Every structure is written in structure tokens, then in C-alpha cells.
Design a protein with these regions (language model features):
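Residue-level detector of buried hydrophobic side-chain packing
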Residues: 11, 79, 176-180, 195, ...
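Surface-exposed molecular-recognition determinants
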Residues: 145, 160, 164-166
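Short, flexible loop/turn segments at beta-strand junctions in immunoglobulin-like
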Residues: 167-171, 221-223
Length: 257
């Protein structure tokens, strides 16, 4: 209940029902940073706690089933703090650690979650605005990025040797193809960024983010772990010679098959 987002929202929903008798279930209001699925879970938790205050509330019927059986369309991620506002792209920012409402290109729920277990240091809009990749990114996607750095001190941002994201609740019967893009305009030095994808096996690829408008890294036929998880790690590449060893993540497209 001390969590600044869903914890406080759950507490507020509980007080609403206890003080007024009005259940919060179904209310459209949700604080910034809380998606619709998380909001419903908070509302249901508060309502059931009020209904049976001396018992642990059973929440097993709320949300998606334990094992994901959904076969989604293309899943697109836009990384950065400026929302793109396009329904077929999932905006992933620094102010939220876990996203539980991930949709595919048709706006259908996928049941997949994305959690920044080791978050990036910050965000910018300094990527390429015109790109030549098979990802077909609009400018609002290709130019926005999350960034990190691993050496020295850069402003108030914390140095992190790597960032890590966990894709959870994947359909364990499917394989996944990843296409990942990183870009940062300007500068004569290398901002090479390495990406590691780890499911049942681990693979690594690198690209040059400096002034990149065409290169992507691809991982094919990635099998999730038995519990439906794939890890994505982002870090400076071996040829990165930027002063603080900056690394970037702008966009990602996942195809399930």
C-alpha cells in the first residue's frame, strides 16, 4: 500500500467504499501512470477487501489467465517519455516500471507484460526523424529514445552498466522474432549499443546508434522460458567510445509465430 502509484490508488478506492458505500469498480478515473488493467485490479482488490475485511481476497479470476494462450499480431513498442499517440504503438516511458496492458497492431490485448527490472537513465528525442527500416516507424517513434550510460557522472542521472526489461506472461507455445532499433543524432564518436535477448537460450547483437537511420538488430525464433519470460538487456557495445559509454533503445517490434 506504500507504492506511490497502484498502492495509493488501491487505498483510495478502499476509503471511497468504506466511507461512502460506493464501490470503485468500473470507475473510469485512474491516476497517470496506471493502465486500465492495473486500475481494474486495484478496484477489485479494494472492493473485495471491503466485502470480506477479515479474509484474504481471492484475485485469481481478475486479469488474464495464468497461462497465456493468445496468438497476437505484431507488437510494437515506442521507448521514450513523449507519447507517440498512435494506437498501434505501445508507449514505454521511464515513469512507470511495469506495463500490464500491451496491445498488438490491431489494438487487441496480448496478455504480455513488460517490466523494467533495471531501468534506463533517461529519455530524449534526438534519434533520426526519417528512417529506412522494415519497422516502418513514424518520426515520433524513431526520434524518441530511452538512454543509459555506464561510466563517470552525467548530470543527475544514475550510471547503470546495463538496462534490463522482462517480457512476461508470454504464450509459451509460441516463438518470437525481435527487431530492435536505436539511434542518437550528432557526435563523431561511437555509441555502439549491444542487445541481449534471453529466453531458453541467449543471443547478443550490436548496432551503431550514432546517426543511425537504417540499421536494426534482429533475433529470430526466440523461445520463452517455461514460465513465459524473455529478458532484454541493453548495454554499451565493445566498440563504444563515447565519453560516458551511452547506450540507447528507441523502438522494438515483436512478431509471434
Amino acid at each position: 500500500h506504500l507504492d506511490l502509484l497502484f498502492g495509493r490508488y488501491t487505498a483510495a478506492c478502499t476509503w471511497l467504499e468504506r466511507l461512502t458505500g460506493v464501490s470503485s469498480v468500473g470507475l473510469s478515473y485512474r491516476p497517470e501512470g496506471i493502465d486500465s488493467l492495473t486500475a481494474l485490479t486495484c478496484q477489485m482488490a479494494a472492493h473485495r477487501a471491503c466485502a470480506t475485511p477479515f479474509h484474504v481476497a481471492d484475485m485469481s479470476d481478475v486479469g488474464f489467465p495464468p497461462v497465456n494462450v493468445i496468438e497476437p499480431g505484431l507488437i510494437k513498442f515506442n521507448f521514450g517519455n513523449e507519447p507517440c499517440g498512435m494506437n498501434d504503438w505501445n508507449d514505454i516511458a521511464t515513469h512507470r516500471r511495469t506495463y500490464t496492458w500491451i496491445t498488438d497492431e490491431h489494438q487487441h490485448p496480448t496478455g504480455i507484460t513488460l517490466t523494467a527490472t533495471h531501468p534506463m537513465s533517461g529519455a530524449n528525442q534526438l534519434g533520426a526523424t526519417y528512417t529506412l527500416t522494415r519497422m516502418l516507424m513514424p518520426a515520433c517513434v524513431s526520434m524518441s529514445a530511452l538512454w543509459g550510460y555506464s561510466q563517470g557522472k552525467f548530470g543527475a542521472a544514475q550510471a547503470r552498466p546495463m538496462a534490463e526489461f522482462v517480457l512476461g506472461h508470454l504464450n509459451p507455445r509460441l516463438k518470437y522474432d525481435f527487431t530492435i532499433y536505436a539511434s542518437r543524432g550528432g557526435g563523431a564518436y561511437s555509441r555502439q549499443t549491444t542487445f541481449v535477448v534471453q529466453g531458453e537460450e541467449s543471443e547478443a547483437e550490436s548496432l551503431q546508434a550514432t546517426d543511425n537511420d537504417h540499421d536494426v538488430v534482429r533475433f529470430r525464433d526466440v523461445c520463452p522460458t517455461a514460465d513465459g519470460r524473455i529478458l532484454l538487456q541493453v548495454m554499451p557495445g565493445p566498440h563504444n567510445n563515447s565519453h560516458h559509454h551511452f547506450y540507447y533503445l528507441n523502438a522494438m517490434v515483436i512478431r509471434a509465430h
